[in-house]
Design a protein with these regions (language model features):
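A transmembrane-helix-recognition feature enriched in membrane-embedded lipid enzymes
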Residues: 2-54, 108
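Soluble catalytic domains of membrane acyltransferases
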Residues: 37-42, 46-207
């Protein structure tokens, strides 16, 4: 760290040259081209991911009306990408909410916590989902606990994601870093089969 601080204070031109050289080298990798050509937005990000890793299986007749989909988050960034692909394919508006404990379980620093936990944020999510009949995907740090509550217009589903690749090899639990590394190493076009193990559909799951 002292070396970097010394270079930044005494030789900023060297540091700038090193940064440009690193970015130039990154451009030759898949992730470099991916980030350069497809900024992480709804219009460019998900179609690009879906083209490289087409999602197979897991189709389910989703009920009409707003849906709360409670999931046990186990694979770091990979679960979020897979559920984003699935939700995008349904053709319905969707949002992903991640519990702060998930970040802590994955070893992320406190500043990485981006999940809204106050009542007003929850109310905004619920109002949005009800107005557009959307899907609210909620990632838990542990299996959701059933609670007998009044659901109103909501359809509540709970489950855990089980993944297998096209060869039938099960994809286990990864850290966020290993998930991205796994994605980068898989050849383009290798389909991912989504097996959605539903834990319950009795309307008794609530955050």
């Amino acid at each position: 760290m002292d070396v970097f601080r010394f270079l930044a204070n005494r030789h900023p031109a060297v540091l700038k040259f090193g940064w440009r050289l690193g970015m130039w080298g990154l451009g030759f990798s898949f992730w470099g081209r991916f980030l350069a050509e497809n900024p992480a937005n709804q219009e460019g990000f998900w179609p690009a991911v879906a083209k490289r890793w087409p999602l197979k299986g897991g189709d389910r007749n989703m009920p009409k009306g707003p849906i709360r989909l409670h999931l046990w988050h186990t694979r770091g960034a990979l679960d979020g990408i897979i559920m984003g692909l699935w939700a995008q394919r349904t053709g319905r508006p969707w949002r992903i909410w991640t519990h702060p404990l998930v970040y802590r379980t994955l070893g992320a620093p406190d500043w990485a916590f981006s999940a809204p936990i106050d009542a007003e944020s929850w109310k905004a999510h619920y109002t949005w989902a009800q107005s557009v009949q959307g899907i609210l995907i909620i990632f838990h740090a542990q299996p959701p606990r059933p609670r007998a509550v009044e659901q109103g217009p909501w359809h509540a589903l709970a489950g855990q994601i089980a993944l297998r690749d096209a060869r039938g090899v099960e994809i286990g639990t990864f850290s966020a870093w290993k998930s991205l590394r796994w994605l980068a190493k898989h050849p383009a076009g290798l389909p991912i089969v989504l097996e959605w193990k539903v834990l319950g559909q009795d309307g008794s799951y609530q955050v």
